[in-house]
Curated annotation (Swiss-Prot):
This is Small heat shock protein hspK. Residues 32-178 form the sHSP domain. Signal peptide: none annotated. It comes from Dictyostelium discoideum. Residues 80-122 are annotated as: Disordered. InterPro entries: A-crystallin/Hsp20_dom, HSP20-like_chaperone, Small_HSP. CDD domains: ACD_sHsps-like. Residues 87-114 have a biased composition (Low complexity).
Amino acid sequence: MTMEFDPRRERRKVQKKMNVFDHRLISSNSNHRINIWRPTVSIKDNKTHISIIFELAGISRDQISIEVTKENTLVITGEKKSKGGLNNLPSSSSSINSDSTTNTNTNTTTTTTTAPPPPSDAQLKNIITIGKFIRSYKLPPGTDSSKIKATMDDGLLEIIIPKDTPSEDRLKIPIQSKL
């Protein structure tokens, strides 16, 4: 059986692993649970500017903060808040019972999977990502942070970082006469 490579599926797998890693790291250092997630990001670098686009569906502008630190680092933070008690839904790792039998004569395996009956008026799992996020990017040397622009439209946050005009390695200085 041949399986085609799906970059979106692979990105989601990596995203999920990173979220689990972040959650374990933070949970082990504190007594309370903090949801941290990493929004999908697209970075484009061209001659005149760098464009960073975040996919932030369900987050308003006032739930996002964009700052530049003294170390010339762009820091983007925000929080996607729950609506209607989404924090209390069971996670996607709900218990599922599985029985497997193998027929050695034909080398086939039959697996029967049964899920526990769902409670009335309850959803089976929470697939909506909520919680806080933080992303940071080291800006190129010579970046004028006052010229950085950010816009948000239809759940997409776009940050435009203008590049400093490239200077030549050597600058020719003309010699003028005193007259």
